């Protein structure tokens, strides 16, 4: 057990004119939590694009001048539990989850996280990830790496369309992202979707073949639209897709969407989690997410297809699905790199680089 008075270090920022930094505060573990809360000693937290997107969009006049803490994914150990907390959450339990916030003083890139397990869902008990003897990462790293990305992918497949079959076909734009990694595993192993086509760079094709994609199309060898069209005609019997899922930001298919996406009446969807253009994470503005074209796609009653902006706050049951898939070995969270807490700047730079193949995780212990 830790000392009763501890120093809680967190990675924070104030607004989009201030850099991220480590801030420290004294925490009295005897009185820092309510009767319905637990204190989690955080072992690891994962970075996600939403972390520095919200940072760069944070105007102090709108969102205040208090410190805001990075990150949402976490893993750790419960070290304190209030008297009204459900007895399924006990001191010593290893847990992980997604702490949802936009500009919260509490975040997960911190040494101690205080939350209400009945409200701050999803939270779950950690499951062991099947590993071989050469695996360099422990269960805390893996446990922190998957909730938000897995949940976003699951929500996309679960929320918008309910009638997946072995005849269903999906096109994934951005096959190499962590969300798409989860998406293809869920699509093939949970929803039993028959055909998943991915778009990625030619250098990523061999890697992505192993993930479960049925076909892969390079975006850097000619026209994406023409290459997918050729695949559709030659291999897919010219069948259209039930869903086009965009995890990177793309608009190439909109002018010819009726050639690729099934009619609206057949419950087909175009779902994006990134907008119409690939984001420059070093220079983000509100226009990247609230463009006129996005608004028109969302509300235009005359468009011939269903367009949705996928959300990163998924249904609570995704966490149980993820646990089961991890235990069965049908999903293993992808890790790009792991950094110590004091290396948080390097971790952020790695994610901003757009070169990460998997999750960037920061360890506190």
From Swiss-Prot:
Chief place of localization: other
A Pfam family reported for this protein in Swiss-Prot or TrEMBL: ADH_N
Keyword set, alphabetical order: Lipid droplet, Mitochondrion
Subcellular location: Lipid droplet; Mitochondrion
Signal peptide residue numbers: none
One GO cellular component, as annotated: lipid droplet
InterPro entries in the record: ADH-like_N, GroES-like_sf, NAD(P)-bd_dom_sf, YIM1/Zinc_Alcohol_DH_Fams
PANTHER family: ALCOHOL DEHYDROGENASE RELATED, RETICULON-4-INTERACTING PROTEIN 1, MITOCHONDRIAL
Family, per entry: Belongs to the YIM1 family.
UniProt name for this protein: Protein YIM1
Source lineage: Eukaryota, Fungi, Dikarya, Ascomycota, Saccharomycotina
């Amino acid at each position: 057990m830790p000392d009763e008075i501890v120093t809680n270090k967190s990675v924070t920022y104030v607004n989009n004119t201030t850099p991220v930094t480590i801030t420290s505060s004294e925490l009295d573990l005897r009185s820092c939590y309510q009767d319905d809360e637990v204190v989690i000693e955080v072992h690891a937290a994962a970075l996600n694009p939403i972390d520095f997107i919200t940072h760069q969009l944070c105007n102090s006049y709108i969102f205040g001048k208090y410190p805001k803490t990075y990150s949402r994914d976490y893993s750790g150990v419960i070290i304190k539990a209030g008297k009204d907390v459900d007895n399924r959450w006990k001191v010593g339990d290893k847990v992980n989850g997604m702490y949802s916030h936009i500009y919260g003083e509490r975040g997960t890139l911190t040494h101690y996280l205080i939350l209400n397990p009945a409200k701050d869902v999803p939270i779950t008990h950690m499951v062991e990830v099947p590993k071989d003897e050469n695996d360099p990462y422990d269960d805390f790293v893996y446990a922190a790496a998957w909730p938000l990305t897995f949940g976003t992918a699951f929500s996309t497949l679960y929320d918008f369309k309910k009638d997946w079959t072995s005849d269903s076909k999906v096109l994934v734009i951005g096959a190499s992202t962590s969300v798409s990694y989860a998406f293809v595993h869920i699509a093939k192993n949970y929803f039993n979707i028959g055909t998943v086509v991915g778009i990625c760079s030619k250098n990523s094709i061999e890697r992505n073949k192993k993930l479960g994609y049925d076909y892969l199309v390079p975006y850097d060898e000619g026209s994406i639209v023409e290459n997918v069209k050729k695949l559709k005609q030659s291999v897919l019997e010219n069948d259209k897709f039930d869903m086009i899922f965009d995890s990177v930001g793309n608009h190439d298919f909109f002018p010819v969407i009726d050639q690729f996406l099934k009619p609206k009446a057949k419950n087909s969807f175009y779902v994006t989690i990134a907008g119409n253009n690939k984001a420059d994470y070093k220079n983000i503005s509100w226009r990247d997410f609230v463009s006129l074209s996005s608004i028109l796609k969302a509300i235009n009653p005359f468009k011939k297809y269903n367009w949705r902006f996928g959300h990163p706050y998924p249904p609570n049951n995704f966490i149980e699905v993820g646990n089961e898939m991890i235990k069965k070995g049908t999903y293993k969270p992808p890790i790009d790199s792991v950094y110590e807490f004091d290396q948080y700047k390097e971790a952020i730079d790695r994610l901003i680089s757009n070169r990460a193949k998997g999750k960037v995780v920061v360890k506190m212990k």
